[in-house]
Each structure stands twice: as C-alpha cells, then as structure tokens.
C-alpha cells in the first residue's frame, strides 16, 4: 500500500461489530489507518479483522464498563500507538411508548448511548489534550433534534450527545483537538431491519460511510445526512408545538 496521510495512524472505533461502526472500521483500514475495533462480541471483531489483515486489531469491550474503557484505551495506545481519531459509535435502541414504558430500558439506553461514549472519552480526551492533537467523533442522530414517538430514551441520549459536542467543540479546539458529531437519518443496518414503521429517506451503509468519511476528512463539526431527512427534522423542530404535535401524533404506531 502506498503511503498516505493516514498510513499507520491509529483510529479507535467502538460499536464495530455491525452496521455503521463495522463499515467505518473497514473503510478506515482500507484508507491506511491502524484501526482498533471494539465491540462486545469477539467473534464479530475477528471476522472484521480478517477482512483487512494487519490493519484491524480487535479489542473486545462493553462500553458501559468505565474501568474496562479506561483499560482498553491504555491497551490500544500501548499496542498500536497514540490514538489520533476516536469514533464512539456503540449504541442501542429500545422503543419507548406509553404502553411499554420501562425505567430499566431507559437506563440501559443512557448507559450505552450516552455514558458509553463518555466512558470511552475518559482515556482518550486527556491524552489528546496533552499531545495537542486528535479528533473525537461522537455518534448522535437526527432524532436528537426533536422528540419523536417511540424514541423517548434513544432521542434523549442523542440530544445529550449533540449538546456535549456543542459544549466541547470551542473548549477542546484551544488544545488542537477537533470535536465532531454525526447525525445520521435512517441507515439500513441490522438494527433498523427490526423497525416496523416507515423510514423515509433510508440509505445504505456504504452511502452513510461516504458522508461520514467526507465529514471527518474535512474536520466538519456536524455531519448530518441525508440532507432531505436533516432538513425535514430541522423544520419539524422549528414548528410551534401545536403544529409539531399534529405531525408527531401521526407517527405513533398502531394508534387506535
């Protein structure tokens, strides 16, 4: 492989066992990065690593375990070198409705989607600040822009991540560290294959990764896609409540 600006630089991708995370890890490795790929299932990681031999190293991890995240960050740097790009992507989704409201599921969503990303920032952020370089990418969602039926817990965590990124961006850039936030719409993955409701502007994983890679290369703060869904969600969020709820009521599944 010819040397490129990314050759042998280290990227850490969580949630790399499937979906967007898996595709991102593979694309980064093909671009020359040394990729530390994390997920809960070792078998998924080993299969991924075999696709780009010598460029992807597996680091099995449960992102809800703060101590394990700290140890994994240290192990990656000891094994591969300084982490220059960190994409925190692990996530879970439990449909939340009036009929099935569950505190336990809400907590699980917060622990994985929000605190999982913060736990992984723990070993990365101080090192990047000390080295005065690096790029941290948080995986949020367009559902973080406005509350939608069934997405109370999921959307809340994504809204929180958008806020975290907005707060950190001007602060971390003082130390040469770039902060980005990814806001995908509906992407065809094993997770969305389970959805029983309409998914407007659905795109495939390769197209999603194209958007993400372009945004990361440009060091954009916000990487939102597809544009049709992003525009629709921003418009919905801007509406007065009476109009907003008139629309979101129609999104409630199996409404009687």
What name fits each language-model region?
Residues 97-98, 102-110:
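Substrate-binding pocket helix/loop in short-chain dehydrogenase/reductase
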Residues 31-47:
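Conserved glycine-rich Rossmann-like NAD(P)H-binding loop of the short-chain dehydrogenase/reductase
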Residues 15-18:
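Conserved glycine-rich cofactor-binding loop
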Residues 121, 157:
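Active-site helix of classical SDR
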Residues 61-71, 103:
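The beta1-alpha1 cofactor-binding region of Rossmann-like NAD(H)/NADP(H)-dependent oxidoreductases
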Residues 141:
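Residue(s) in the substrate-gating loop at a strand-loop-helix junction
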Residues 181, 197-232:
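C-terminal helical subdomain
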């Amino acid at each position: 492989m010819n040397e490129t600006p990314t050759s042998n630089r280290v990227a850490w991708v969580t949630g790399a066992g499937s979906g967007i995370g898996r595709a991102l890890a593979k694309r980064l490795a093909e671009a020359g990065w040394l990729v530390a790929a994390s997920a809960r299932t070792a078998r998924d990681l080993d299969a991924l690593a075999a696709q780009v031999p010598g460029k992807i190293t597996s680091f099995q991890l449960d992102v809800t375990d703060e101590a394990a995240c700290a140890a994994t960050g240290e192990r990656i740097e000891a094994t591969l070198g300084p982490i220059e790009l960190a994409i925190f992507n692990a996530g879970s989704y439990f449909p939340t409705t009036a009929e099935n409201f569950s505190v336990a599921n809400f907590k699980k969503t917060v622990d994985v989607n929000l605190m999982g990303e913060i736990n992984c920032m723990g070993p990365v952020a101080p090192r990047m600040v000390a080295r005065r370089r690096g790029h941290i990418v948080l995986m949020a969602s367009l559902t973080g822009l406005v509350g939608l039926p069934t997405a109370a817990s999921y959307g809340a965590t994504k809204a929180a991540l958008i806020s975290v990124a907005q707060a950190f961006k001007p602060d971390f850039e003082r130390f040469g560290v770039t902060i980005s936030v990814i806001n995908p719409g509906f992407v065809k993955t094993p997770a969305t294959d389970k959805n029983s409701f309409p998914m407007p502007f659905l795109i495939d994983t390769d197209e999603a990764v194209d958007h993400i890679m372009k945004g990361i290369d440009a060091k954009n703060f916000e990487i939102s896609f597809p544009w049709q869904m992003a525009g629709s969600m921003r418009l919905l969020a801007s509406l007065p409540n009476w109009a907003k709820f008139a629309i979101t009521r129609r999104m409630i599944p199996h409404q009687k």
